A protein has these predicted regions:
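Short catalytic helix/loop segments, enriched in acidic residues and glycine
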Residues: 20-39
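A short helix->loop->beta-strand "cap" motif at the edges of active sites that frequently abuts
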Residues: 155-160, 232-235
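Conserved phosphate/ATP/ADP-binding segment of small-molecule kinases
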Residues: 171-260
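Alpha-helix C-terminal capping segments
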Residues: 30, 38-48, 291-294
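Conserved N-terminal subdomain of the carbohydrate kinase-like
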Residues: 48-137, 327-341
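Positively charged, low-complexity intrinsically disordered leader regions
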Residues: 1-20
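Conserved post-catalytic alpha-helical subdomain immediately downstream of the catalytic base
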Residues: 264-334
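Beta-barrel outer-membrane channel/assembly domains of diderm bacteria
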Residues: 9-15, 37-44
């Protein structure tokens, strides 16, 4: 089974040891990006996963490519050109101090890319699944067009399409997001959202919910999922449910709605002690795609995806380094964290 994802792979610069930007003397240099993170998860699970983007032909662009290759991601369809690799600065929060993310991605290679840079008919030959997020079209009108052409080609090739709404207010307005994502979601089969994105992008929200106070009305998300499915004729809608007690401790669960069976399945809830939250949603997406491609039931699929994401929260960096057996062990109820000898 082959999966293709498209998006921006960025340099991630982060102070060491929970330092603030204003006190840091050095920064850790790694790579990450929503759809690239999903591709790494799937490659670690043993699937044929390819990532599509545009990166400069210089050494930093090559380092970005190499960061994917080391985990087995197919990088052969990455277009080379342009001058910049996008950057994001990440200041990790702790306790009552929230994390801070600052973007420096203007004029990156993918932001300036054109639809003609990608041969989607060739890219989707023999592909089973295509994934993108709402972060990528937020880069500009030209990238919206790239995503639209990708979705149209994927449909023409009979490829399943998933999208994580992933609204980023630092990249575009709600009005811009709604206009673009309305067009793109017409092609989507599986939608992933969270307690904020459905509201920010489409104005759909759960009642009696206070995400910052750690209060979620799980039943209210049935209505959110159904409204999303009815609006765009999705086959499935996944809603991740995060209870933010503080920056270091979150409650984490999810719901998966299967339209054909009218089945709403809620996962077990994990109480997380967070090492690194970045990439947590992407690891959920990767877990869900893997589970659905492997024919897991609605309940088993959401349990696998949530367990994968719970484990990612224990790992530094954007990428999820867990194996299928490790995820299945947690999904099956073994969360003891005991030493394996």
């Amino acid at each position: 089974m082959k999966v293709v994802t498209v998006g921006e792979l960025m340099v991630r610069l982060q102070p060491f040891n929970y330092e603030r930007f204003v006190q840091a003397n050095s920064l850790e240099f790694t790579f990450g990006g929503g759809e690239a993170n999903v591709a790494v998860s799937l490659a670690n699970y043993g699937l044929d996963a390819a990532f599509v983007t545009k990166l400069p032909a210089h050494a930093i662009g090559q380092a970005a490519v190499n960061s994917l290759r080391r985990y087995g991601v197919d990088t052969s369809m990455i277009t080379r050109g342009g001058d910049r690799v996008g950057i994001y600065y990440n200041e990790k929060g702790a306790s009552q101090r929230g994390s801070v993310c600052i973007y420096d991605r203007a004029n990156s290679a993918i932001q300036l890319a054109q639809p003609s840079d990608f041969d989607w008919d060739k890219i989707f030959e023999g592909v089973d699944w295509f994934h993108f997020t709402g972060i990528t079209p937020a880069l500009g009108a030209n990238v919206v067009e790239i995503c639209l052409e990708a979705c149209k080609a994927a449909k023409a090739h009979g490829v399943k399409i998933s999208c994580d709404l992933n609204y980023r207010g630092k990249l575009w307005t709600r009005e811009q997001a709604r206009e673009a994502m309305t067009k793109l979601c017409e092609y989507v089969d599986v939608c992933i959202s969270n307690e904020e994105d459905a509201k920010d992008v489409f104005g759909i929200e759960a009642e009696a919910t206070d995400i910052y106070g750690g209060k979620l009305n799980a039943e209210g998300y049935k209505s959110v999922a159904k409204q999303l499915a009815d609006k765009f004729h999705f086959e499935k809608v996944a809603i991740t449910l995060r209870e933010s007690h503080n920056a270091s401790e979150n409650g984490w669960s999810a719901m998966l709605y299967d339209v054909a069976s009218n089945e709403y399945c809620f996962s077990k809830k994990y109480e997380l002690k967070i090492i690194d939250r970045v990439g947590g949603g992407d690891s959920f997406g990767g877990g869900l795609i893997y589970a659905l491609l492997n024919g897991k039931s609605t309940q088993d699929a959401v349990e696998f995806a949530v367990a994968a994401s719970a484990l990612k929260h224990t790992i530094e960096g954007d990428y999820n380094m867990m194996t299928v057996s490790e995820v299945e062990k947690l999904a099956g109820g073994d969360g003891s964290g005991r030493i394996q000898r």
